[in-house]
A protein has these predicted regions:
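A short, glycine/small-residue-rich beta-strand->loop->alpha-helix junction that serves as a flexible
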Residues: 7-19
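Donor-nucleotide binding loops and adjacent catalytic segments primarily
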Residues: 193-269
């Protein structure tokens, strides 16, 4: 079978999942004919993606979330205003996606949570079946438990998730643990897609804390904590592309440009891991048996962190309070069930992708009403 990938380019999670799925498909005799990746002025495609993906990569301009002026949590108002101005550009991108779907000769389109893919299918109804993959589709599962959060923000998150999957035959929801499928919402629950490099690493406990932050503004938190605890080695990765590959602050604090090989190597040998609660790196740390401090940067990561904590991954904080992480690490016990769950990903995924999806109904726009109509009591209660 021939597959076309369309990938949200924000962060490293969806990019890593695309690399992993391409490896699985190629290993089993299938072909990825092309990879379309969303781009924006505030994000750069990491070098590890171009080095590891085999199919031709093409870019298109896509919506993205802007951080607050302090470059920490995502600012919803700034993001909405910015993306409204860019609407004409996004319309061009939708037309481009439609053209690439038609020209690719693909048997399936795999959508890694890219909004414009859903809008393309809503507006043009391409004949090639679309299958959506991402942990975010678990937010639409009838049994998913949300953290206590602003009801409007949660409704918007679910609305956005539905928009990404308009016209999809199936939603494949990556999960920290086994859950029953939700056929009513076209949701199949599957294990996380971890790269084989993660499974090949032999973890050990070093003397340093490893970390990753999507928004570089969190580096101030890390440096503040470091000044108070200079004896504890810290090695953090960030997306601050204007900096040198390794910014060595002193003998015990360094910031690294995102490099997947080095990132995983350092994770395998760390004492503990601190992150802005992106799904992919939390899964990698869980697989390697590392205690985790999760510092969510937006509502999606609030949900990730809450769900990961339920699975025994670690603790949640509003900032990089690494002392909390060190205390938690003393009594931490890895979740071995997670490792067994992850090892079933390839078999489960191939079964689903190779099956005939013609019996599934497309997810239409009126599905949005199922997820984004909070009651007046919910809205008033969120203030």
């Amino acid at each position: 079978m021939k597959f076309l990938f369309i990938v949200q380019g924000e962060g490293r999670g969806h990019l890593t999942q695309a690399i992993t799925l391409e490896e699985i498909l190629r290993r089993n005799g299938h072909e990825v004919v092309e990879v379309l990746v969303g781009k924006s002025s505030s994000r750069r495609l990491p070098g590890f993606f171009n080095r590891n993906i085999h199919a031709p990569v093409k870019r298109f301009v896509s919506p993205n979330f802007l951080p607050t002026p302090a470059n920490k949590r995502v600012s919803l108002m700034r993001s909405v205003a910015y993306n409204l101005v860019k609407l004409p550009v996004y319309i061009n991108s939708i037309n481009y996606i439609r053209q690439r779907i038609e020209a690719s000769g693909a048997d399936r389109v795999i959508n890694f949570y890219e909004l414009l893919t859903g809008l393309t299918y809503f507006l043009f109804r391409p004949s090639v079946p679309q299958i959506c993959i991402g942990h975010q589709y678990l937010f639409l599962h009838k049994s998913f438990e949300f953290p206590k959060a602003d009801k409007v923000s949660l409704a918007l998150l679910k609305f956005f998730t539905v928009l990404t999957s308009l016209g999809a035959k199936e939603r494949l929801a990556l999960s920290f643990r086994y859950m029953k499928d939700d056929p009513q919402n076209n949701i199949r629950v599957i294990p996380p897609l971890l790269r084989k490099e993660v499974t090949l690493h032999e973890p050990y406990s070093g003397d340093y804390i490893h970390g990753y932050m999507v928004n570089a503004g969190f580096s101030e938190n890390v440096m503040k904590w470091h000044r108070q605890h200079p004896g504890i080695p810290l090695r953090f990765f960030w997306d601050k592309w204007e900096e040198e590959p390794v910014k060595r602050v002193d003998n015990t604090l360094s910031f690294y440009q995102l490099d997947d090989v080095e990132f995983l190597r350092q994770m395998a040998g760390c004492k503990a891991y601190a992150s802005t609660a992106g799904f992919e790196s939390v899964c990698e740390a869980m697989y390697l048996g590392k205690p985790i401090l999760m510092v969510p940067a937006h509502i999606e990561q609030d949900c990730n962190a809450y769900d990961a904590k339920k699975s025994g991954a670690g603790i949640i904080s509003s900032d990089f309070n690494l002392q909390q992480l060190l205390e938690f690490a003393k009594d931490y016990h890895p979740n071995r069930d997670f490792v067994y769950w992850v090892r079933g990903a390839e078999y489960t995924l191939l079964n689903l992708l190779e099956s005939d999806s013609s019996n599934y109904q497309q997810v239409l726009f009126n599905d949005c009403l199922l997820y984004t109509s909070p009651s007046p009591r919910d809205i008033s209660g969120s203030r």
